[in-house]
């Protein structure tokens, strides 16, 4: 019998293409593992904010007394973070319990000529754990896109689509409407769907998909926000949806979380219509206590954010300019080569007075010197570090006693930084 570390190694060592769209492999894995898919699922797609939205909804449902499951990606520091039961990462005993049948099923498929990806194995592992642990409800985050994503085997009780932006364009398309069409692929027949505020073209894509599937559609708009006051550690917001939600405290910082929380409230209202018991108190307490690491996360005088695409980096820039307007800032950053775009470079230049670049521990990483050169060409004062440890030390030296270190560029980089800072993942 394999232990947790061996199971995780087997998952990471599976078919090395890393990403493959389709459903059959996950269905075959689940069939071989005798997983019945009985757990009620909320399925969430989107470019940005889907992880935060999932985390907030899970926190609310847990406060309401439900036994919850949560599946997200990628992880920051440890694989087990991706699969949570009642808010806690999958423990070693459950990893062994559900991981061994998973590895055996994958080996049988390889012997039959099929090859599974790490994401397919992770999806099957999560669904097996939710089923085996008799979760009352689980929230499943799409990996990429939606229409062809391996998570799209689920038959959810509710779908949600968060903010749409330009990311994964080689796979999903070069326009917001094309990307929205891929995200809308999670919409199922007669299944309610909640959609984040969006531009008219994107709203039209969602409306057409919902009509095709006879899915009750709730398209949100910023008109429902009655009052909002942001600070460096969260926000206090009032909304008018099916009911008025007064002075909702959000524990996740950033103005973008106001719209994510709006989606959560609309999802709560829809679940209530389906018969789920979710008291107002559970909603207020759940949103006020949500923890989602590396999303504008404060660690002393350091601010860690997983921003890794134009929309995310712009949200980070807006946050530091609004909440830290007179604060000297040092940026510590590492990015993936296939993610970096011109808009991101300009926004990173605006975030800080001094920039230190590092090379993330990822085969897709952009070399730190190449990154620093690109920033300098756009007017920044940037320098490359040879390692994360060297970069962190240099950022601290530049920050001195009065500056804030802002760390961003990649979730992989953010996870490595949390480890370097001694932050626990459990």
PLM-predicted stretches and their roles:
Residues 1-48, 52-67, 76-78, 134, ...:
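N-terminal leader/targeting and accessory segments in enzymes
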Residues 23, 27-37, 63-154, 170, ...:
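ATP-dependent carboxylate-amine ligase catalytic core
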Residues 38-40, 132, 137-142, 149-160, ...:
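Nucleotide phosphate-binding/pyrophosphate-handling subdomain across enzymes
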Residues 57, 147-157, 418-421:
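Short Gly/Thr/Asp-enriched flexible loops that form oxyanion-binding sites at enzyme active sites
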Residues 71, 196-197, 209-231, 250-255, ...:
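Beta-strand->loop->alpha-helix junctions that form or flank phosphate-binding loops
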Residues 109-110, 134-141, 156-247, 261, ...:
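Acidic, Mg2+-coordinating active-site environments of NTP-dependent enzymes
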Residues 199-218, 233, 302, 310, ...:
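C-terminal helical cap/extension that packs against the catalytic core
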Residues 410:
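Active-site-proximal loop/hinge segments that shape catalytic or ion-binding/gating pockets
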């Amino acid at each position: 019998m394999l232990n947790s570390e061996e199971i995780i190694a087997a998952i990471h060592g599976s078919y090395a293409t890393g990403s493959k769209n389709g459903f059959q492999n996950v269905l075959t894995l689940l069939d071989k593992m005798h997983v019945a898919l009985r757990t009620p699922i909320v399925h969430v797609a989107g470019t940005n904010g889907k992880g935060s939205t999932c985390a907030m909804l899970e926190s609310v449902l847990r406060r309401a007394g439900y036994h919850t499951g949560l599946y997200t990606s990628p992880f920051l520091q440890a694989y087990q973070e991706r699969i949570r039961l009642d808010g806690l990462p999958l423990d070693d005993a459950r990893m062994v319990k559900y991981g061994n049948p998973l590895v055996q099923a994958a080996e049988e498929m390889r012997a039959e000529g099929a090859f599974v990806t790490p994401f397919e194995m992770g999806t099957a592992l999560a669904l097996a754990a939710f089923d085996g642990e008799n979760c009352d409800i689980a929230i499943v985050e799409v990996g990429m896109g939606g229409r062809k994503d391996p998570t799209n085997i689920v038959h959810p009780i509710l779908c949600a689509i968060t903010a749409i932006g330009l990311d994964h364009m080689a796979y999903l398309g070069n326009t917001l409407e094309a990307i929205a069409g891929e995200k809308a692929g999670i919409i199922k027949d007669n299944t309610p769907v909640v959609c984040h505020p969006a531009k008219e073209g994107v709203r039209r894509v969602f409306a057409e998909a919902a009509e095709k599937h006879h899915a009750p559609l709730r398209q949100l708009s910023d008109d429902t926000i009655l009052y909002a006051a942001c600070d460096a550690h969260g926000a206090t917001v009032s909304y008018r949806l099916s009911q008025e939600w007064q002075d909702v405290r959000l524990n996740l910082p950033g103005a973008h979380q106001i719209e994510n929380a709006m989606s959560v409230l609309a999802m709560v209202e829809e679940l209530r219509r389906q018969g789920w018991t979710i008291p107002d108190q559970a909603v207020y307490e759940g949103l006020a206590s949500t923890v989602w690491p590396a999303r504008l996360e404060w660690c002393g005088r350091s601010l860690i954010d997983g921003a890794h695409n134009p929309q995310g980096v712009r949200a980070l820039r807006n946050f530091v300019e609004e909440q830290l307007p007179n604060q000297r800032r040092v940026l510590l950053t590492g990015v993936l080569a296939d993610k970096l775009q011109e808009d991101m470079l300009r926004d990173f230049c605006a975030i800080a007075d001094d920039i230190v670049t590092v090379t993330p521990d990822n085969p897709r990483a952009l070399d730190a010197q190449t990154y620093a050169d690109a920033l300098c060409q756009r007017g920044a004062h940037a320098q490359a570090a040879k390692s994360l440890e060297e970069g962190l030390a240099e950022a601290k030296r530049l920050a001195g006693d009065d500056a804030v270190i802002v760390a961003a560029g990649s979730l992989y980089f953010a996870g490595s930084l949390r480890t370097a800072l001694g932050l626990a993942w459990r």
